[in-house]
């Protein structure tokens, strides 16, 4: 995608960059949580991944709606919008992969583990822990219009 953007001289608006940075930080945190939980066999940390994944999905949906607004107001072109949407879809896929890895971790040691996330009751969304983490991440990664967010595309090492 970055090559396509460079070759076609595609540029996002500052608002689009700000929004992408928020969801990108959430994805980075989810990847770091997933890696640390997996490397340390930390099932407690693994339970933080699903609520963060739901926040990422929600953010991506919200940002797609913001893109539609920019498109309808003439503040964004189709080419930029296609790349923007592709990036958001990639973030969603990363979140799903992290959740799948954590299902495998949380079910490891079970006598008959069913590793299919869609059948899994491993992430009860009605638990107090899930709601607590969800609320924490919702506040941390809230999209606020016209608020300055640091624009960073630098790679980050797993902590």
Regions from the language model: what does each represent?
Residues 1-159:
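Cytosolic, long alpha-helical scaffolding segments
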